From Swiss-Prot:
The keyword Cytoplasm applies. The lineage of its organism: Bacteria, Pseudomonadati, Pseudomonadota, Alphaproteobacteria, Hyphomicrobiales. One of its GO terms (biological process) is coenzyme A biosynthetic process. Keywords: ATP-binding, Coenzyme A biosynthesis, Cytoplasm, Kinase, Nucleotide-binding, Transferase. This is Dephospho-CoA kinase.
Length: 195
């Protein structure tokens, strides 16, 4: 079974590309979705509330409050990552084990910080989703609760797009229309199934 890492900086179109893989019948593990699921778990909620008092409201993590804390304190960001990342990797391993048992030929791991967290060692090939900076910024600024400071903070935590592209086995350029992105995904799937 081939394990493919799908990565890209914020607002590059990674989720759209992941959806196209799913539509083609490829199993996709989403690190972000897994984090959101973990945030609903009572033990994790308790741990987050204990570590970051006031960010859990009505049984949910207030992600806006949490992000405001993390933007201003890199040690707290590291603390959160130490809590969450091992649990995400555990879920990733379960996903891979299940896919192997099901006889899948290819699986995709959608991991935003694949390079930054040394995840490239866990995959056979890497796909980087990329778009021109102007498009990336335009997409980012349409997100709720996004501003220049938060955009700069997130970008600073991520490897520059050009470096990711240099390390990629495949690049999906999402700067054009959705049909173009879909065709690129389809071509990559064909290539992976042949080799």
């Amino acid at each position: 079974m081939k394990i493919i890492g799908l990565t890209g900086s914020i607002a590059m179109g990674k989720s759209t590309a992941a959806d196209f893989f799913k539509q083609a019948g490829i199993s996709v593990f989403s690190a972000d979705e897994t984090v959101h699921q973990l945030y609903k778990s009572k033990p994790i909620l308790s741990l987050i509330e204990h570590t970051f008092p006031g960010v859990v409201e009505n049984g949910k993590v207030n992600r806006l409050k949490l992000s405001k804390i993390l933007i201003n304190d890199s040690e707290k960001l590291q603390t959160l990552e130490e809590i969450i990342h091992p649990l995400v990797q555990e879920k990733e391993k379960e996903f891979i084990d299940t896919a192997r048992q099901q006889g899948k030929k290819i699986v995709v791991l959608d991991i935003p910080l694949l390079f930054e967290k040394k995840g490239e060692k866990r995959v056979d090939s890497i796909i980087v989703v990329s778009a021109p900076l102007a498009i990336q910024k335009e997409r980012t600024m349409t997100r709720p609760d996004m501003n220049e400071k938060k955009f700069s903070f997130i970008n600073a935590k991520q490897m520059p797009d050009e470096k990711k592209r240099e390390r990629a086995d495949f690049i999906i350029n999402t700067g054009k229309d959705l049909e173009n992105t879909h065709q690129q995904v389809f071509s990559i799937i064909e290539n992976l199934l042949k080799n």
